[in-house]
Amino acid sequence: MADLYQLQRAMRAMRQSAFQRGALAILDLGSTKIGCLILRFDGLDPSLDSDQVGSLAGQSSFQVVGSAITRSRGIEFGEISSMQEAERAIRTVLQSAQKMANLRVDHLIACFSGGGPRSYGLNGVVKIENQIVRDEDIARVLSSCDLPDIGDGREILHAQPVNFALDHRSGLVDPRGQIGNNLDVDLHMLTVRAKTIRDLAHCVKRCDLELAGVASAAYVSGRSTLVEDEQELGAVCIDFGGGSTSYSIFLKKHMIFAGSIMLGGNHVTRDISLGLQVPTAVAEKIKTRNGGLIATGIDDRDLIEVGGETGDWEHDRRTVTRSELIGIMRPRIEEILEDVRAQLEIAGFYELKSQKFVLTGGTSQTPGLDTLASRILGQQVRIGRPLRIHRLPQAYSGSSCSALVGLALFAAHPQDEWWDFELPNTSYSSRTVRKAVRWLRENW
């Protein structure tokens, strides 16, 4: 655990250095595309009313000065599969974004959806020594949290306090300075495979940059697409990526659970390619232009020219109906939604009073997805687009860029993490996530 704290604190120090230099690169490592933004920081933003505890909360105002997107290479299921290919793709997108910004950056923050994320709900309690809560008490109560056995080869990606209680007065955001006898904390911890982070750090180093932070794509997508009421009352953001589909549950403006399944839009494209006997590139084009999930009477008469370059005139000139295409696409999307629902049930999401679903990511733009999702997941479903940020190009305002925009918000205005405090070394056993979600529902 100490090694992890050192790694995370070192990245935070690099982030502070980037703030001082005034520029930072943001990188979204997707299986379909890699996106990059160059942010220029203008210093502390006095207009921000931060409700966080840590010293980095509400850090800086910023604007986008460079941006680029390139086709993903060397990335599968949200993590690096080929170091050389990934390095070339990252160099390409970084060079394009830096050229647009007309400046060079030395630090980079990245997000990814891979690594097999696992969520844990932790709880800790300490007695206040002088009755007035101080920074030392915050550190002590965090260190008293039950530490789970996360297993070999895994590291903590996020460890965020989501609720403080002082003498059973729950829902406190910042208890410092208040008077009481017992301080409780609830903390959400997200772990991933250590190899995923190590490969990313090594690849960034090969690109002559320093890794100044990492984040879950599910988490940052939620930060950019969920409106304030949804984050407060309870909602889940489902990010439909190319290689995987990730999701994050928010309550009281904090992420309390996250996970992913290894199915995404690329699997739909593959199904079309196999079903229509066409190359993957043609299948992707057909999916984008003509795809859908809810068939109507007119779709039986709506003909789609498949095309091809086999040399067989009849084969290359054949057509299929849109109903046939929907029949190929829908089973895979239903499988993804049913798998997500199963994991949300395990997490206890359906025990929350508010059950809103926000769909984002490239595949979320498929016509009829919101209707199909409302039948499988729940009634309150909408398609989410990222918040507008200063000087963000219009091309980056769609659902496919939710994680990229959310990562920019995360970089400038991070929430507190466990390692932001000086912690003594203590370990106990963990609580289950379902108990943690139920506790939050009953006490907040």
Per-region residue spans from a language model:
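Short, conserved catalytic/metal-binding motifs centered on acidic residues
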Residues: 110, 272, 359
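C-terminal structural cap/anchor segments
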Residues: 314-391, 396
